[in-house]
Amino acid sequence: MSDAHGVARDQLRAFIERIERLEEEKKTIADDIKDVYGEAKGMGFDTKILKKVVALRKKDEQERMEEEAILDTYLHALGMIEAPPEG
């Protein structure tokens, strides 16, 4: 086996092992988040709404406003609201 082949193999193994460690950390974090939602639910909070709030906080104000305007337009088209708000 050539030395270059061995180096490539070692690098590949190192990448794979790093990915595996990160995947395990990701699973642990996901489990922790699930536990927090469970705690919140136990205190009477609606977890679906909490998840929406978390998603909204990730977006900037302009992005949220654009999405809300599009949503209002769709709801109006379906007759679910009177008219989209004037902006």
From Swiss-Prot:
Among Pfam families, the record links this protein to: GapR_DNA-bd
Domain of life the protein comes from: Bacteria
Task: Provide the leader sequence positions.
Answer: none
Mind listing the GO molecular function terms for this protein?
DNA binding
Q: Which HAMAP family does UniProt cross-reference here?
A: UPF0335
Instruction: Say which family it is in.
Output: Belongs to the UPF0335 family.
Protein known as: UPF0335 protein RHE_CH03546
